[in-house]
Amino acid sequence: MQIAITRGVSAGIAACELTHLERQPIDLPRARAQHRAYEEALARAGCRVESQPALDDLPDSVFVEDVAIVLDEIAIVTRPGADSRRPETAHIAPALSNYRRVTFIQPPGTLDGGDVLRLGRRIFVGRSGRSDESGIEQLRAVVWPYGYTVTAVPISGCLHLKSAVTEAAAGAVLVNPAWVDAAAFGAVRAIEIDPEEPYAANGLLVGGRLIYPEAFPRTRQRLEAAGIGIEPVDVSELQKAEGAVTCCSLVFSE
């Protein structure tokens, strides 16, 4: 059984952190409706969705991916690079402790889960404004005993590594080559986004299908031409908060 931990949309999401986007008004009821539809897509993909309550004083807390990394053997609670997000970690640890032994990234290191891409036993971490060398080295020390390798990857022009690349299918990644070099990921099939859709590289592979934003029809055509099944979702309000489909859940085997 796949577990998907999510968290409700904060009433304060309009005050979210923004790095590469201009602030726009966010329709809170619509954002919450889109989030519920996203949870339904996870359930259709075979996940048992465990929705945590919204944290109205923590604007970015719907983006649970950034505060933890869950492997088969252990869960790592991160130390987010944005000061405003660090209180979120105390709220995710209890939910994870039901399933895994939990460890924590320690100061002064910083690490955002959005910078962490796992491909089998290989873990890639974006060198970003949110994840530093200390955080990456701490992650490496935690996962090495379980047989994982950790490789730091340069990125440019985007918030997180998974803004630039995500797993699209077994042995394939969806990538924006302007933001990351696909060669960093070795012998995988690289499907490039349509250059007119720079934010289109983020999809969530669950149950053999890719949960994918409706906002990127050109790139969706490329994915479908590559034989990848798409589960479309509308996350337009969450995208205004610099979020994407991987950001809104932690998916792992029970």
Language model region names:
Residues 1-254:
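The feature marks the mature, well-folded catalytic cores of soluble enzymes
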